[in-house]
């Protein structure tokens, strides 16, 4: 009985110490906040690493929809409509998903953005916008998944996704000029 009473405080101390240990995530959180023209755009995602693996075709199978990251849903939020060619992504927050193949990718902006990873059941009616991009083969390896907003202009930019030796780009435009003119007229 005495041994149990002596061990009890040590058990509590051990539990307390374990509760205070913080470990880094295998796929750390990444977040971009970018002003493009008058639009505020943010993308939050987890950044898995290559870790000496073959990423596309193995870790991320070709022809299957992927959650574009790890852990929580990858999300994009925009305060202005984004115009991708003839298609418009309306103001809001979307889950981002991709379907890579050997030569091109499809990128999906999904209206449901609160789930963890892939939706339990994919619903095409929740795809707000579907885009395609040819693959750009890189000469150097990008160790961690990287999503960026590049080629910034007054009324345009590019969402770029890079990992391993692959890059895809999705250029978009904004209606900045008419908003500025309307502001001047006020």
Give each language-model segment a name.
Residues 1-22:
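Bacterial Sec-dependent N-terminal signal peptides
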Residues 8, 44, 77, 97, ...:
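Beta-strand residues in well-ordered beta-sheet regions across diverse protein folds
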Residues 15-16, 90, 155:
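Generic detector of short, well-ordered, non-transmembrane alpha-helical segments enriched
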Residues 20-61, 113-185:
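Primarily secretory-pathway and cell-envelope proteins
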Residues 57-73:
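Aromatic- and Gly/Pro-rich amphipathic surface segment
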Residues 69-114:
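Mid-length scaffold segments of soluble, non-membrane domains
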